[in-house]
Swiss-Prot record:
It is an enzyme of class 2 (transferase). It comes from Chromobacterium violaceum (strain ATCC 12472 / DSM 30191 / JCM 1249 / CCUG 213 / NBRC 12614 / NCIMB 9131 / NCTC 9757 / MK). Inhibited by fructose 1,6-bisphosphate (FBP). Keywords: ATP-binding, Glycerol metabolism, Kinase, Nucleotide-binding, Transferase. The gene is glpK. Pathway: Polyol metabolism; glycerol degradation via glycerol kinase pathway; sn-glycerol 3-phosphate from glycerol: step 1/1. This is Glycerol kinase. Its EC number is 2.7.1.30. Belongs to the FGGY kinase family. GO terms for molecular function: ATP binding; glycerol kinase activity.
Length: 500
C-alpha cells in the first residue's frame, strides 16, 4: 500500500486535536484547537456543535499540512470523542436544533431521580450496564425534545437526527450521507442494549425518543463512508470509531481479558477488559462495551474518579501552596511521606466505587508539625488511593487479580505518584513511551479496517515501555496506609451523613 499515514481525530471536552501516525505508531504531526465552554446556568454545560465541527476539520487540515503531505497519503481516518455529549440536528439542513449538551451537564438529574423513584434503575442497568444518571445521553435527548419548540413533532416525523460527537463529525465529513455510531459510543447513551446489541425499544419508550432519530450502530473498525473531497482534497475512508476511554484501552493494547489501564487526567478513568461477556458489577462500576473488531464484541468494567489531577490544580489555585502544577512533585519530595495526613478530594462528592454525592473534601491527621509538603504529598497520594479503590472493586467484580496497571495521561509524568501507585497496589505500574493512547487507539482501529495494519497481533509489538514501576513498600506499611485512607474516606462520608 502506497498510503503512508493514518489520521486520528481526537475530539475532546476542551479541545479538538488531529494526530498523524505512521506505520510504526509514531506521531508524525499534531494540531490542536481549544473551543468555548458554554455555561448558561449553574450545572449546565454546552458546546457549539458548529464550532466543534469547524475546529476539528481545521486541525485535520493543519496536521496534514504540517507533515508536508496531502490527503492522498492518508490511508484512513479514525475518530475518538468525548462520550455521552449529545447533539440533535435537522436532517434536511444539517443545522443543530440546540447546542451540544455535554456529558458533565446535570440539568436532567431530576428526571433521572424520577426514573429511579419509579423503580426503573435495575431495568435500565440490566439492559445497558449503566447506573441511571444525567451523565448519559438518553435524558439529554429527551430534554432537547421537551424544551426546543417543535422538536418533538419534528422528531416524530423523522426530520431530526441524534448523534454523539462521532456521529456528528461523520455526518459532516460525508455531507449528510452517513448517519452512524459505533458500539462503544452507543453503549453510553442509556438507550442501547449491550446484550442484544440493539437500540432498546422499551428504553426508547421510557425516554420518549423516536427510533428514527438514532444512528445505525456499527463495529469500531470498518469503513463507514468517505470524507467529501472538499475537506482534504480527496475522498478518504473513515474507518475507526471509539469513545475516548475505550480508544485509550485499545491504544494501550489492553486487548485480552484481565488487562487494565488508568488514564490520569482532571479525573481518572479506569477500564478493565473483561472479554466477550459483560460482567455485572456489584461494586458500583459501569459495565460497558469496549469495542467490536472483526465481528467480536469485547466488554469492559469502568470506574470514574472525579478528582484526579484536579487536586493539584486546587493546591495551586485554591490553597496557593504551589505556583505551577509541576511544582507539586518537588514540594511533595521534601518529606519522606505524608506523616499520617490524608486528603480526600471529595470536592464534588466521591465517584466509583463509592458514588456518594454528598461527601466533601476532607483533610485528617494534621498536627502543628504538618507542613505544606505533607499536604502536597497527601494530595498526590489521594490519586493513588482512589485508583486502588476502583481497582479492588474491579478485581472483586471480575473474580481475577490484576497483574499490572498500564497508565497514561498528564499526571503519569510524576515519578513520585507512579511509584506510590505501584507500592499501594502491590502490582507493577507500566508507562508507555507514547502517552497519546486515545488518538493511537482510534488510528489503530481505522488502520486495521483498511489493511494498513494486518491484525491486532501486528500492532501488539508496537507497544513500547517507557518505565516500569515496581512495588517497593513493605506489606505491613501498605496495610497501615490503606487503613488510614479508609478511615479518612469514612470521615468524608460521615461529614455528609451528619449534614443530612
Amino acid at each position: 500500500m502506497t498510503d503512508q499515514y493514518v489520521l486520528a481525530l481526537d475530539q475532546g471536552t476542551t479541545s479538538s486535536r488531529a494526530i498523524l501516525f505512521n506505520r510504526s505508531g509514531d506521531i508524525v504531526s499534531l494540531a490542536q484547537k481549544e473551543f468555548r465552554q458554554i455555561y448558561p446556568q449553574p450545572g449546565w454545560v454546552e458546546h457549539d456543535p458548529q464550532e466543534i465541527w469547524g475546529g476539528q476539520v481545521g486541525v485535520a487540515a493543519e496536521a496534514v499540512a504540517k507533515a508536508g503531505i496531502d490527503g492522498r497519503s492518508i490511508a484512513a481516518i479514525g475518530i475518538t470523542n468525548q462520550r455521552e455529549t449529545t447533539i440533535v440536528w435537522d436532517r434536511e439542513t444539517g443545522q443543530p436544533v440546540y447546542n451540544a449538551i455535554v456529558w458533565q451537564d446535570r440539568r436532567t438529574a431530576e428526571f433521572c431521580d424520577e426514573l429511579k423513584a419509579r423503580g426503573l434503575g435495575e431495568l435500565i442497568r440490566s439492559k445497558t450496564g449503566l447506573l441511571v444518571d444525567a451523565y448519559f445521553s438518553g435524558s439529554k435527548i429527551k430534554w432537547i425534545l421537551d424544551n426546543v419548540p417543535g422538536a418533538r413533532d419534528r422528531a416524530r416525523e423523522g426530520k431530526l437526527a441524534f448523534g454523539t460527537v462521532d456521529s456528528w463529525l461523520i455526518w459532516n465529513f460525508t455531507h449528510g450521507k452517513v448517519h452512524v455510531t459505533d458500539v462503544s459510543n452507543a453503549s453510553r447513551t442509556m438507550l442501547y442494549n449491550i446484550h442484544t446489541l440493539q437500540w432498546d425499544a422499551e428504553l426508547l419508550d421510557i425516554m420518549g425518543i423516536p427510533a428514527s432519530m438514532l444512528p445505525e450502530v456499527k463495529s469500531s473498525s470498518e469503513v463507514y463512508g468517505h470524507t467529501h473531497a472538499a475537506h482534504l482534497g480527496v475522498e478518504i475512508p473513515i474507518a475507526g470509531v471509539a469513545g475516548d476511554q475505550q480508544a485509550a484501552l485499545f491504544g494501550q493494547q489492553c486487548t485480552t481479558p484481565g488487562m487494565v489501564k488508568n488514564t490520569y487526567g482532571t479525573g481518572c478513568f479506569m477500564m478493565l477488559n473483561t472479554g466477550d461477556k459483560p460482567i455485572e458489577s456489584s461494586n458500583n462500576l459501569l459495565t460497558t462495551i469496549a469495542w467490536k473488531v472483526d465481528g467480536k464484541v469485547q466488554y469492559a468494567l469502568e470506574g470514574s474518579i472525579f478528582i484526579g489531577g484536579a487536586v493539584v490544580k486546587w493546591l495551586r489555585d485554591g490553597l496557593g501552596i504551589i505556583r505551577h502544577s509541576a511544582d507539586v512533585g518537588p514540594l511533595a519530595q521534601e518529606v519522606k511521606n505524608s506523616d499520617g495526613v490524608y486528603l480526600v478530594p471529595a470536592f464534588a462528592g466521591l465517584g466509583a466505587p463509592h458514588w456518594n454525592a454528598s461527601a466533601r473534601g476532607t483533610i485528617v491527621g494534621a498536627t502543628l508539625g504538618t507542613k505544606a509538603a505533607h499536604i502536597a504529598r497527601a494530595a498526590l497520594d489521594s490519586i493513588a488511593y482512589q485508583t486502588r479503590d476502583v481497582l479492588k472493586a474491579m478485581e472483586a467484580d471480575a473474580g481475577m487479580s490484576i497483574a499490572e496497571l498500564r497508565v497514561d495521561g498528564g499526571a503519569t509524568v510524576n515519578e513520585l505518584l507512579m511509584q506510590f501507585q505501584s507500592d499501594i497496589l502491590a502490582v507493577d505500574v507500566v508507562r508507555p513511551k507514547i502517552t497519546e493512547t486515545t488518538a493511537l487507539g482510534a488510528a489503530y482501529l481505522a488502520g486495521l479496517a483498511v489493511g494498513y495494519w494486518k491484525s491486532v497481533d501486528d500492532i501488539q509489538g508496537q507497544w513500547q515501555l517507557d518505565r516500569r514501576f515496581q512495588p517497593a513498600m513493605a506489606a505491613d506499611e501498605v496495610l497501615a496506609n490503606v487503613k488510614g485512607w479508609q478511615r479518612a474516606v469514612n470521615a468524608a462520608k460521615v461529614w455528609a451523613d451528619d449534614q443530612a
